[in-house]
């Protein structure tokens, strides 16, 4: 499930940054496949945004890494966006907007979370589908995505 995979990717990133994985930053980790989402709430969002939202809390401790999770077809769960980006500031930024990230995750409302943050990945429909990609960029110093993530 996407909500389990997000924290697992945060753990893999922590091990990379600590040097306990056999790799050292700077490095890029690439993952592919398609996770699942058990829909229990009324929210909107797809598996990539749910994965990113689930990674958000543990990612708070990762000052030198950023995660992008996106569908290669450009449409994550029928939302019109490909996915989302998470960095160490995402959790605090969402809380500062008056949102409860745990409630949003419970409501399957990851789309609203990343729309409010402005951290959705917008590609438009790509005309291809080679599953989902998770890209982790880990550096020797803090990594911060530039906004906008992609031109609209």
Annotate each PLM feature.
Residues 1-53, 57-61:
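A glycine- and small/hydrophobic-rich beta-loop-beta segment
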Residues 53-152:
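Internal helix-turn-beta structural module
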């Amino acid at each position: 499930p996407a909500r389990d995979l997000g924290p697992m990717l945060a753990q893999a990133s922590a091990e990379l940054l600590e040097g306990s994985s056999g790799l050292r930053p700077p490095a890029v980790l690439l993952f592919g496949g398609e996770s699942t989402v058990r829909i229990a709430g009324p929210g909107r969002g797809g598996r990539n945004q749910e994965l990113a939202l689930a990674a958000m809390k543990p990612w708070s401790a990762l000052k030198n890494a950023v995660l992008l999770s996106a569908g290669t077809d450009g449409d994550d769960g029928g939302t019109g966006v490909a996915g989302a980006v998470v960095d160490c500031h995402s959790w605090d930024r969402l809380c500062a907007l008056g949102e409860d990230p745990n409630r949003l995750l419970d409501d399957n409302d990851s789309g609203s979370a990343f729309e409010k943050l402005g951290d959705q990945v917008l590609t438009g429909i790509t005309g291809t589908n080679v599953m989902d990609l998770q890209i982790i960029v880990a550096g020797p110093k803090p990594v911060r995505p530039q906004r906008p993530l992609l031109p609209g």
